[in-house]
Each structure stands twice: as C-alpha cells, then as structure tokens.
C-alpha cells in the first residue's frame, strides 16, 4: 500500500490524482492533503479519503474544519502547513499538484524528507530548477514527471544514457487561439482563452497554453528534469494531442509516447512507477479512426511568450524566476479583466528587460527576486 501526500487537492491535477487513488483502493491511500480556499470540496475529500493531516490556506478554515472533524485529523494552514504535508512521515510519495511558485518550499521540504516526488508543479523548476535538482541528487530522491509531455519523454528515454539522446521534441496543442492570426488576438476575452480544445485544466495553465507560455515553462522544466541544453529541446505544434512528446536519438531513431489526452494516465504512471497498472475504463487509442495526425513548426514571433521562455532559460540565473513571477502576475490580472491578452507578453518582456540577473542564486535570493517582481507588477 503506497501512502500519498497531495499538494493542491482541489485543483485540476489534484482532483484527477484522487480519481486514480479512487480507482485503486488496494494500492493507494491518501495520508495527507493540502488545498487552498475551496472548503466545500476539501470537506468532501476529507470525508471520502480520511487523511490524517490536512492543510488549508487560511487559519480560520483550519479552525472550522477542526471543529467539524475533531481530533482524529490534524489541521494546519499556510506555508508551514504545506511543508508539513510535504514531509509527512507516513507518506511514501508527494504529488505536487499545486499551481505557482508557492510550490517551491514544500517541494524542497519533501525532498529533504527523502520522499519520492511526483512533480506537476512546473513553476518550481522554472524559478529554482538548480536548487530542486541539486537537492534531489543530494538526497537520492526521484523526481517523477506528471506533465503529459515530460511523462512521455521519461517513458521514451527508458534509462538510455544522456549521450545517446540528440534532442527532445515537446508537442503543443496550440491552445485556445491556435487558429487565430496575431491581429485577431488583440481583443480576445477571458472566456475565449479558457476554452481549451483538448485538455481539461485549471484557469492559469489554460491561459498559459493560450499564450504558449505553458510550453515555454515546460521547455525549462525539461532542461532541469533531463539535463539537456536548450538547443536540444524543440517544440512542435500537434493539434490532436495524441503524441505527447518524442525523443530523437543520435542514430536518428525517434521514440514517441502516444495516447488519448487524459491527465489521469501520466498521473497514474507517476504513482505506480516503475510498474504499470491496467486502466480498463480508459479510452483505447484508435489510430485507424483518427486517420491523420497533423504537425506544424512553432512560430516564435506569433507565440512570443515561447521566445521569451527560451531567452530567459538561456540567460539562466534569476531570469527564469522573473519570467515565472511576471507571468503569474500578468495571467492573474488578465483573468481579473485588468489587462488585455497581448499585454501578458508585454508585461513579461518588460520585466525581463529591466532585470539584472544573479547567475547562481541562493534560495533567499530567488525568494527576494520573486517577491520584488510581484510587488512591482501588482502596483
């Protein structure tokens, strides 16, 4: 029986992780969970899965839940609560399904407690990848990717040495506006941006998909997870989201991982690795019915956030911290109706242009830069 700590239980990845746990009650137990402010859903999850430790965002919510459930469950809150869930002694693996750089400290806490980490929180690797990877190596902790693209690469690599790999090819659906010209993007609405053609995701990642920043963040994530240079990581538009990513080897063999677009598949693989469990209810891929798969080159001028991500990644240091923080603030402001869709990339570009990067930042320096950028852009 594998004990699981889940960070971000009420979000898209979190609820789909619970679907997997629900499907395999003899294999998985939810020992601890952390969520934000969705108290109603959290309450239902506690009743169903009966974790021993729960953390919420606000102290008053922790007090409310403690009054309802009594002493059989420990309730915590805030940043310390997140870290406690991440390093909970009874857990074997931690799923970091929380969105944003708030996931950094609990991820490091899980690693230092020598917990296996199923990482779905790409912002942590973007803002502080060198610290996370270094800590994982130091503590001999596996970082198992949950994102469909990185799970695909993880499977396609299958233990091959790095010297055998020529390049990684991440696929991208193109997002909500893949068929619109750049001129047509000027007046798009929040509702239009949230209508993703293939995947069911949270609001932030859906907007990131529309700007193509999500794929940019995934390029940086891939660099840290697999230890390759940016020149070895390419992106290809693939509208059907059937090929989740590919690895091209030095002998020009290309190995791809295919499947219908359902996040529960890579989530399950991260939880069961190195084993595979059957999913009899899952839709089987029928290539004959699909008939054709389509691919397009990535247009860096149309999708400028992708270009910014590569530039920040190559610059290194705190440039990716700025990229991530500026993007989080800009997306939040767009969702609140404060800025237009195309202003997201402008805000990010201006923040990057104004920043003097620190080459090898400490955790404290990353936190300071992150806080400074957020304060500037929220003003």
From Swiss-Prot:
Q: Name one Pfam family in it.
A: DXPR_C
What is an annotated GO biological process for this record, any one? isopentenyl diphosphate biosynthetic process, methylerythritol 4-phosphate pathway involved in terpenoid biosynthetic process
Needed cofactors, names only, are: Mg(2+); Mn(2+)
State its Enzyme Commission number(s).
1.1.1.267
> What domain of life is recorded for the organism?
Bacteria
Q: Quickly give the catalysed reaction.
A: 2-C-methyl-D-erythritol 4-phosphate + NADP(+) = 1-deoxy-D-xylulose 5-phosphate + NADPH + H(+)
Q: In which pathway does it act?
A: Isoprenoid biosynthesis; isopentenyl diphosphate biosynthesis via DXP pathway; isopentenyl diphosphate from 1-deoxy-D-xylulose 5-phosphate: step 1/6
The protein's UniProt keywords, in alphabetical order, are:
Isoprene biosynthesis, Manganese, Metal-binding, NADP, Oxidoreductase
Q: Name one GO molecular function term.
A: manganese ion binding
Query: Which residues are 1-deoxy-D-xylulose 5-phosphate-binding?
Result: 122, 148-149, 173, 196, 209, 214-215, 218
Q: Would the keyword Zinc be found if you checked this record's keyword annotation?
A: no
SUPFAM superfamilies documented for this protein: 1-deoxy-D-xylulose-5-phosphate reductoisomerase, C-terminal domain, Glyceraldehyde-3-phosphate dehydrogenase-like, C-terminal domain, NAD(P)-binding Rossmann-fold domains
The residues that hold Mn(2+) are 147, 149, 218
Q: Which cysteines are joined by disulfide bonds?
A: none
Entry's InterPro entries?
Answer: DXP_reductoisomerase (IPR003821), DXP_reductoisomerase_C (IPR013644), DXP_reductoisomerase_N (IPR013512), DXPR_C (IPR026877), DXPR_C_sf (IPR036169), NAD(P)-bd_dom_sf (IPR036291)
The entry marks the following residues as binding NADPH, namely: 10-13, 36, 38, 121, 123, 202
Family membership: Belongs to the DXR family.
Q: Provide the function of this protein.
A: Catalyzes the NADPH-dependent rearrangement and reduction of 1-deoxy-D-xylulose-5-phosphate (DXP) to 2-C-methyl-D-erythritol 4-phosphate (MEP).
Family matches, as NCBIfam families: Dxr, PRK12464.1
- What is the protein named? 1-deoxy-D-xylulose 5-phosphate reductoisomerase
Q: What organism is the protein native to?
A: Shouchella clausii (strain KSM-K16)
Q: Read off the lineage from the record.
A: Bacteria, Bacillati, Bacillota, Bacilli, Bacillales
């Amino acid at each position: 029986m594998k004990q699981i700590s889940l960070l971000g239980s009420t979000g898209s990845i979190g609820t789909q992780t619970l679907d997997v746990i629900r499907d395999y009650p003899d294999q998985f137990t939810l020992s601890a969970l952390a969520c934000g402010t969705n108290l109603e859903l959290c309450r239902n999850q506690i009743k169903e899965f009966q974790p021993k430790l729960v953390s919420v965002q606000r102290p008053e919510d922790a007090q409310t839940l403690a009054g309802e459930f009594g002493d059989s469950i420990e309730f915590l809150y805030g940043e310390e609560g997140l870290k406690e869930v991440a390093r909970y002694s009874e857990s074997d693996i931690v799923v970091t399904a929380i969105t944003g750089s708030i996931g950094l400290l609990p991820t490091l806490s899980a690693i230092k407690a020598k917990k296996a980490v199923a990482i779905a929180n790409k912002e942590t690797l973007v803002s502080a990848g060198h610290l996370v990877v270094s800590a994982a190596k130091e503590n001999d902790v596996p970082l198992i990717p949950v994102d469909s693209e990185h799970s695909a690469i993880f499977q396609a690599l299958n233990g091959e040495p790095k010297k055998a790999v020529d390049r990684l090819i991440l696929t991208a659906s193109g997002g909500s506006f893949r068929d619109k010209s750049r001129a047509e993007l000027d007046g798009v609405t929040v509702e239009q941006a949230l209508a993703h053609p293939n995947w069911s995701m949270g609001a932030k990642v859906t907007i990131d998909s529309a700007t193509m920043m999500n794929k940019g963040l995934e390029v940086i994530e891939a660099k840290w997870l697999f230890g390759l240079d940016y020149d070895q990581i390419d992106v290809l538009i693939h509208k059907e989201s059937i090929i989740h990513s590919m690895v091209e080897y030095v002998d020009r063999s290309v190995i791809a991982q295919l499947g219908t677009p359902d996040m529960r598949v890579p989530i399950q693989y991260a939880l069961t690795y190195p084993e595979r469990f059957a999913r009899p209810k899952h839709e089987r891929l029928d290539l004959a019915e699909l008939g054709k798969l389509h691919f397009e080159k990535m247009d860096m001028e149309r999708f400028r956030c992708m270009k910014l991500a590569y530039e920040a990644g190559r610059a290194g240091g705190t440039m990716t911290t700025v990229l991530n923080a500026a993007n989080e603030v800009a997306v939040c402001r767009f969702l609140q109706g404060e800025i237009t869709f195309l202003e997201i990339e402008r805000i990010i570009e201006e923040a990057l242009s104004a920043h003097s990067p620190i080459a090898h930042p400490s955790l404290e320096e990353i936190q300071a830069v992150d806080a400074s950028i957020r304060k500037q852009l929220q003003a």
